[in-house]
UniProtKB/Swiss-Prot annotation:
Catalyzes the phosphorolysis of diverse nucleosides, yielding D-ribose 1-phosphate and the respective free bases. Can use uridine, adenosine, guanosine, cytidine, thymidine, inosine and xanthosine as substrates. Also catalyzes the reverse reactions. It is an enzyme of class 2 (transferase). PANTHER family: PYRIMIDINE/PURINE NUCLEOSIDE PHOSPHORYLASE (PTHR36540), PYRIMIDINE_PURINE NUCLEOSIDE PHOSPHORYLASE (PTHR36540:SF1). Its EC number is 2.4.2.1, 2.4.2.2. Belongs to the nucleoside phosphorylase PpnP family. Pfam families: Ppnp. GO terms for molecular function: guanosine phosphorylase activity; purine-nucleoside phosphorylase activity; thymidine phosphorylase activity; uridine phosphorylase activity. This is Pyrimidine/purine nucleoside phosphorylase. It catalyses: a purine D-ribonucleoside + phosphate = a purine nucleobase + alpha-D-ribose 1-phosphate; adenosine + phosphate = alpha-D-ribose 1-phosphate + adenine; cytidine + phosphate = cytosine + alpha-D-ribose 1-phosphate; guanosine + phosphate = alpha-D-ribose 1-phosphate + guanine. One of its GO terms (cellular component) is cytosol. The lineage of its organism: Bacteria, Pseudomonadati, Pseudomonadota, Gammaproteobacteria, Pseudomonadales. Coiled coil: none annotated. It comes from Marinobacter nauticus (strain ATCC 700491 / DSM 11845 / VT8) (Marinobacter aquaeolei). Keywords: Glycosyltransferase, Transferase.
């Protein structure tokens, strides 16, 4: 079954589903800057657009474009910002 999630007053929306290997969400982040928390390891892949992130323990922001991925450990938080709508796929575990 699909579960729709909405965060930051509707500026981030995702649909949760079970991929062939791991639980996942696919969603869109609207222009802005956000801070996300993780409960378990997440691998985030940019599908369309560009996402600039500040990963835990890092001092420099990194930019990821379509087809690029980054990982965040569980029980952590990271910041993300974008200038335009950006689509992503996130797998958990």
């Amino acid at each position: 079954m699909l579960t729709v999630n909405e965060y930051f007053d509707g500026k981030v929306k995702s649909v949760a589903f079970q991929s062939s290997t791991l639980p996942a969400t696919i969603g869109v982040i609207s222009a802005g800057e956000y801070e996300f928390g993780t409960s378990e390891k997440e691998t985030m892949t940019v599908v369309s657009g560009e996402l600039t992130v500040l990963l835990p323990g890092q001092q420099d922001w990194q930019t990821f474009g379509a087809g690029e991925s980054f990982e965040v450990a569980g029980q952590a938080s990271f910041k993300a910002k974008t200038d335009a709508d950006t689509a992503y796929l996130c797998t958990y575990g």
